[in-house]
Amino acid sequence: ALVVWLAFTSAVIAGESPTVEDQMAGLVAMCAESEQARAQRHAETPLYDRLGGSEKITAMTAEIIRLHSINPDFRRFWGEIDEERLIKNVSDFVSTGTGGPKVYEGRDMPSAHAHLELSAADFLSAGGDVMHAMQNKGYGENEIQEMVCILVSMKDQVITK
């Protein structure tokens, strides 16, 4: 994930502007190429454990939500969000999806995101917040890549425009 992000950042600095479609295609390709390595790491130690368990996942989620709350791309709907509830639901979702014991009881991804009318650019912006939050919390490239690829696997469920 960091390699792809740095490649796109370098392209922008060099005066090139990768399109949203190019960035999405790059993420999909990265996730496809790393699928076996990610599965092997998860089989050895579930991502839940490598993320540090429930408390650290909640702290990471709170940082993601904090970054979303100050992200200008999300101002248009942030006022209607209950941050505490969102942190709990996302933490439970991440815990469940990474091999932890929590049971996610929230809405499915299409239902939870449909009213937000997210574009591919919004998706990339949210993914950037996830990567920065994980870096802020000290996670390594493997864990960041795995979280990004989990998000990429759900892109068709949340991108609606």
Regions found by a protein language model. Name each.
Residues 15-161:
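Core of compact, soluble alpha-helical bundle domains
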Residues 1-11:
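Bacterial N-terminal signal peptides
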